[in-house]
Each structure stands twice: as C-alpha cells, then as structure tokens.
Amino acid sequence: MIEKNYQPADIEARMSVVWEDSLAFKAGRPDRRDAVPFTIVIPPPNVTGSLHMGHALNNTLQDILCRFERMRGRDVLWQPGTDHAGIATQMVVERQLMERQQPGRREMGREKFLERVWQWKAESGDTIINQLKRLGASCDWSRERFTMDEGLSKAVIKVFVELHRDGLIYKDKRLVNWDTKLLTAISDLEVQQTEVKGSLWYLRYPIEGKTFSPEDPSSFIVVATTRPETMLGDTGVAVHPDDERYQKLIGKHVILPLVGRKVEIVADDYSDPEKGSGAVKVTPAHDFNDFEVGNRHGLRRISVLDKEGCLDLLDNEDYLRDLPEGAAQFAEEFNKVDRFVARKRIVERLESFGFVERIEPHTHMVPHGDRSNSVIEPYLTDQWYVDAKTLAKPAIAAVRSGETSFVPKNWEKTYFEWMENIQPWCISRQLWWGHQIPAWYGPDGKVFVAETEEEAISHALGYYVEQEVITAEQGREMALDRNKREGFITRDEDVLDTWFSSALWPFSTLGWPEDAPEVQRYYPTNALVTGFDIIFFWVARMMMMGLHFMKEVPFSTIYIHALVRDEKGAKMSKSKGNVIDPLHLIDEYGADALRFTLAAMAAQGRDIKLATSRVEGYRNFATKLWNASRFAEMNHCAVPEGFEPAKAKETLNRWIAHESAHTTREVTEAIEAYRFNDAAGAIYRFVWNVYCDWYVELAKPVLLGPDSPAKDETRAMVAWARDEILKLLHPFMPFITEELWEVTAKRDGLLALAAWPLKPAEPTPEQLAMFAAAAGPTDPLISPALIVPIFDHADFTDPKAEAEIGWVIDLVTQIRSVRAEMNIPPATLTALVLAGASAETRERAPRWTDVIKRMARLSDISFADRAPDGAVQLLVRGEVAALPLKGVIDVAAERTRLDKEIGKADADIKRAESKLANEKFVANAAEEVVEEEREKREAALARKAKLLEALERLKQAS
C-alpha cells in the first residue's frame, strides 16, 4: 500500500539497501553473462573530496546511461573508484598533524608519514563514495578501485618502465609551475590565474660601448617588466626583426644594470613592436615564453631563485660566471632575500642609478597555486617527462577518423588545438604521497629504471662491472648479500603526477597488466562523461595511454557536459558565497528531485543556471506522480494477467497507449543521443500533462462510475500506463520509481532490472494516410496543441483515437486560455458554440460534452452554422469554436486593463534594450548580468505578444 505522503529520505534509505542486498548493479550477473557489455568508468573523484554540484551533474548523467542500458538488457559495468590526489591528500594530513600539534611530515620521516596517510584514508576516504551512493549512483560497488591499490600501482610501474625503455619517458631540465609553499611542481590544472593590481616597470638597459645617460635615449634600450627581481637572470633582449628602430642593434649587447652581465640583442617574432618600447627582456629560466625564445637563440638559462622563492646568487655558478669585479658584493647583499622583498629593493637600487624610466599601474593575471594560494614561479629544474607529442599522434588520428567522437562535436576543435600543440608532460612531483618513481641512481648518478629494486640492483651491478667500477667478484657478493649493497643505489624520491595513474584508469581498473577476463570483456568502454576542464589533463591522456598499451581507443564516445552555475549564471565560488551544496538539496527535496533538475537542464553546450526553486518544482513533480499512483491504487487499478494494451476498446485508453508509445520513442532516442534535457522534458510532459492532467482527469467519470467492461479496461490501462511511466522515469528518478514499482503490484524483480519499453516502429504509408484523414485540416497560425500528433506507431497505436482525444484537449486548452486572457472569473460559466461543425465533430462532441463542460467551465455546448456576434472565435483542428462573451465581461474595462499591461511591457522592453544598446554596459558588466537583461527583454516581448493577442480577441467580442 502506498503511504499517504511522499517522504524521499525514507524511500532513499530503504531502496539503497534493497539494491545493495540484491546485487542489482553487479557486472557479470549470471542473468547477463551472455548480454552485450556496456562500460563506463567513473571520473575518479579525489579521495579527499566531498560531493559538489559538478559531481552531482556528472554522476547523474552517467547513472542515467547505466540504468537505461541495464534495463535494455546490457551487462553494465559502471566502474567506481577514487583518486589518491597527491597534493590534496598530503596537505589534508599535514594540516591534521598541525591542528593536533603532532610532529610534522619532516619530523616523522617518509615511512611513518605514509603510514599516517593510509590511516587517514581508511578513516575518511569513503566520504565521497557514500555521498555518491546517496545520489543513487548504480556503480558496481564491489569493484571499487583506488589509484594506489596494489593492482593499479603495478600497472603504473609497468607503464613507466615500458615508456622509459621506448624512449618516451626521459629526464630533462625545463621550466615547470613551481609552488614555493608546497615545494613541488604542479600541473597547469592546479594553477589559477588571479587578477592582481600591480605595476609595470620600464627599465633602461645601457647599450654596450656607449656612455649611459638617462637624458640620452640613444645610450639605452627601454624594456618593461612586471617582475623586476627576475632581471638578474636576463640573458637577452628581444626585438622584432622588422622593427626599424632596432635594426642596427640586432646582434649587439646591452649591459644588465646592477649585475654587469653582457646581454645579446636578438631578433624574434615574440616581441610586439606595438607594445611598449617594442623591446622585451628575455629571462629563459623564469618565464615560459622566454624559455622558448632562449632555445631559439641559444641563450643561457640562469636561475636566480631557490625552491622557496628567495634569491639564490652567492653559490650560483651560472649567475656568477663572467660577471665583472664587484658583482659578488651585490650577490652577497641580496642572497636569500624573499622575491617580493627583493623586488622592492632592486627597484630602489635601479632608481638610484637612473635605470628606471617610469612606473605605471598595471592590472594583470598572476598564476597562483589553487591549494597553497602562493604565487607560482616558472622554475628551471630537473624533472621526468613524457614525450606527449609522439603519443598524441594516434590519439589525434582516432578522433579525426571517428573512432572516438565528442558530443557536442565542437569540443573536437579544442581537443585538436591542444593535442597538435602539445608540450612534454612533466610527470614528477616533489611529494611523498603517490606512486614513487621506479628509478634508482648509482654512485655516479647513472639512472636505472626497473619494476623492482632487485631488478634495478641487477642492472646496476651489471653496468658497473662492465664499466670496471667494481670487480665481477664484488658484483657477485653484492648480489648475494643485501648488507654489502646497502646504499649502493638510491631511489628517486619524487612521485608521479596524479594524472599519470588516472590516465590508465579505463584498463588498470579491469586488472591490466594481468590477463584478466574483465579486460577482454569490458575494454574498450562505451562512453566517457566528463567536464570540459579536464579534456587535456585526463581525457587526452587516457586516449594516448589506451592506444599505446591496449591498441584500442579507451572509449567510443566522449560526452562533455557544461558547468553548473548559480541562478544568475555566475560561477559558484566560496568567495562569492553562492555555492549550492547538493547534499543540502538532497536533504531538503530528495535525490530524485535534484537528479531530475540537473538532467532537465543539461542541454548540450549550455551551462546550467541552478535555482533552488527548480529543485523544489521537480520535488512537486515527484509528489504529483506519487499522488497519481495513490489515486490509481484507491480506485483498484491493476494490470490483470495477460492484459494487452493493443486490444483496448475505449478511445481514451487507446489514446494513452499511443501517447505512451510516442514518449517511449522520444525518451529512448534522446538518451541515445545524449540529449538528457530532451529526454527529461519528454517524460515530464507525459507524466504531468498527458497522464495526470488529461488521462486521469478524463478517466475519472469512468473510474468513479458504475462497474462495466469499460471501467475494468480503464483500471487496467491506468495501471499499465503508470508502469510504463515508472520504467521511462527510472533512470532519472530511481528511488521513487523503484519504491512505487515495489508497492503497486506483486513483481518478479526489481524495476532496475526490468525491461525497457520497446521503441515503436515507423508507420506504414497506409497508417500515415489514415492519421492525416483523422486529424483533419490544420492552421499553421494556431499555437501548437498540448498534445502534438506524432507519426510513431506500435501495435496499439490508433490515429483515430489520437485525433478524437486530441480534439478534446485542444478545445479545452484554448477555452481555458481565452478565459485567463479575458479575466473571466472561475465561477462564471460561459457557453460554447461549435460553428459549421463537421459530421465527425457532431458525432464525437456528445460523447465528451459533460467532460468538456466540467473542465472548461461551460454552461452549454451547442451547434450553429456560424459563430454568433460578439463571440471570441477559436480555431480547433481546422474548425471554429465560439465563446459568446456579451454580458460576461466588461469589454471596455478589459480593454483598458490590457492597454495598461501592454504599456508596462513596452516600458520593460525599452529599459532592457537601452541597457543592451549601451556598449560600456555590455563590455564591462558581468556576463551573467548582461544575460539577465537579455532574458528580461525576451520575457517582456513574449508577455507583450500574448497581451496583443488577447486584445485582438477582445475586438472580436465587441
């Protein structure tokens, strides 16, 4: 029996247990062993994470696909798991140690600290997984993986060793994003560009061989910089090759102020003649663009900062080389001074010598670490790299050939732009938590890469015996006695970038590199659902690794969803205070309401503007379904054994079967095409408008009337249509549908494993002709009816039934619309005249007279050859229906009211258009504010159009 009130929390708790106990989501179930597999790997959330709105959207869409395919009979594997999240996790544990006033990481040592991290993971690492379960994610939780699991770690080590063997992993000295607080390289994804109000310093660099004078422009070149402290590492000045001002200076030198180093003037397209002086300082060791300029011209790379962001000058051979006498004194004075303190002091020193031409206020973007919030330094250091350019070629080809496709397709352009300009991938991190790099160093720094330390020792001993560094006898002794080789080789302390292990996720989670049957069955996966922000960092790298090691693409389709923003379109952020917590929404409205909201708003390529009111609205939608199901139960509606909708005799029942078939097709095709919003919209309209508002209302006289064959058939059809709704709605709202499936009838199994409704076949030409004849003529000027005739047919489709019920609905809908437009009070009944009605209308109208009168608030329905004077005329499926309003409303007063409302709409339109015509407003206002004005204008235009239509109708009645 269905409870009186819909209580989402109780249902969600109960259904979660039912699904778990029944192993409903287990891949490879005995009843699916021969089924076609369908695989999705979850984008593994950070083990430190908590469910945010992006997770909620991403996992709702994945779950819709998985539940849909499971109901279609597929053997579904939705592979769950979490990412070890190197920096984030290490920071969480370090912060915890600090808060508890316990020894820090350095004091504990690596081994003890890692034990503590694993302890934290055991205690707190399931938070995000439990939250995903609350959302209703139908993953195979028995297969949950963690990127630091033993099996996945084995895959990581094997991939590193093989790529190194093939020359695709190597060590190099290049610039990285360096976090001076965390003391590690970080990825581009972990860098946030923050707008900062700073300064632009214009500096005078004296030309070699000329006597410098601030009053003599021919004695110096002016360069501009936002980071004066890095000038100590300048090794060049770049000018554009076509800039006539500097033609004679190319190849000559300037003398670096304060330092005295000779710096070459080079010609390079990087310099923009239109910006500033047209000359730029080149600091290859402290700027990514300068690094490339330096490579093109063979300029020295002089790093002048240490890992903590302090000047590093005194023991810096690169810096001190070829400097004039007296430079050491400057180095001693500024050595180990913090970069920002040094900036101020260097500028003061430059000003004292006349080397500063001017200083301008300058607002610019400065990179910050997303976790430490410290200013990121481009830092020259030895790191491990992947030859991404080589690995990218097959990944580019796979998308170009269509082997893997993006949805929406426009994301392919983004993918190609990045992949075709890909840079070496820095994969080493100066952390303790993560996959330690499988590389060992011999006494002379020689690198030995191996899967195990024993293997590395073997390689090292063989090498040093061959090089005659040790004797063969020493080699044998060291091989046999661990004590004798203690400390002979030392392991690289760095760990791998988190994205390295994540790149293997589609196959490492299945058991690779072991010959696991799951690899054969579930790889490649079918689809990947993810956000656009990790196309480069994760999607592209999975493509590269999958093709290299599995020789197949990891997924055939990549669906890229948009962002979830606040209701005004602003990006959610803690600083703005506009973050919406999905768990709060689940507590308040239920997981089903949140899921349906996100799906209904997930239009391809369009960000979601999430308002709490929308979630509340879809909770009301769930309540309406609940109440409709209770109504069916109270009226003893049930599907008898052997019931066939195709054999229904009542027109109303054949109509709902037709609409159900049409909706099945709409929902099925929309999900197949990743048009989640269209699928949600179709099922919403069917439940709320077709089933609840029309079918149940039209069926009430039969259900509440005396027993009859028609009543028995209607009871069966009400229950059958409800069951079809539960099936179609289940991927979107799994909890309420599973609950109603269980309590409305005795079932053989779970709704989660029930068969998806069949999609109807295309109509035959004969059926099309029959439908056209039944529908009658149409007028393109009339607004579309609530129920649009669709040429979709299953065995039970009846175009004649659709034409008849569609006529009733169109008629009632248009009458209600006119009553609302004309401000006719609900208690006031009006007459209806069917003018010049066809024989078919004269035949069908009496069957529905009582229903139409009740639903349209009519006093009488009559027939006439023409519409009476003073009546508003409606065109319903090509025929005239007239509402005589003489004496019903005060026409003059209503016209005055409408004119006033039109004036208000005009004022709103003018106000919005004035703002939108203001170029300064459009250029400077926040994007969401501009969009809000556009929406106001469109709403006012639509309101005015309806008011004008009402005014036109009023003229008919006067």
Curated annotation (Swiss-Prot):
**Which family, according to UniProt?**
Belongs to the class-I aminoacyl-tRNA synthetase family. ValS type 1 subfamily.
Identify this protein by name.
Answer: Valine--tRNA ligase
> What cellular component terms from Gene Ontology apply here?
cytosol
Q: Which gene encodes it?
A: valS
| Protein role | Catalyzes the attachment of valine to tRNA(Val). As ValRS can inadvertently accommodate and process structurally similar amino acids such as threonine, to avoid such errors, it has a 'posttransfer' editing activity that hydrolyzes mischarged Thr-tRNA(Val) in a tRNA-dependent manner.
Motif 'HIGH' region: list the residue ranges: 45-55
One annotated GO molecular function: valine-tRNA ligase activity
Mainly localized where?
Answer: cytoplasm
Instruction: Please give the organism.
Output: Bradyrhizobium diazoefficiens (strain JCM 10833 / BCRC 13528 / IAM 13628 / NBRC 14792 / USDA 110)
Q: Which reaction does it catalyse?
A: tRNA(Val) + L-valine + ATP = L-valyl-tRNA(Val) + AMP + diphosphate
Residues binding ATP are: 574
- EC assignment: 6.1.1.9
Q: What class of enzyme is it?
A: ligase
Extent of motif 'KMSKS' region: 571-575
- Indicate yes or no for the key word Aminoacyl-tRNA synthetase: yes
Cite the domain annotation text.
ValRS has two distinct active sites: one for aminoacylation and one for editing. The misactivated threonine is translocated from the active site to the editing site.
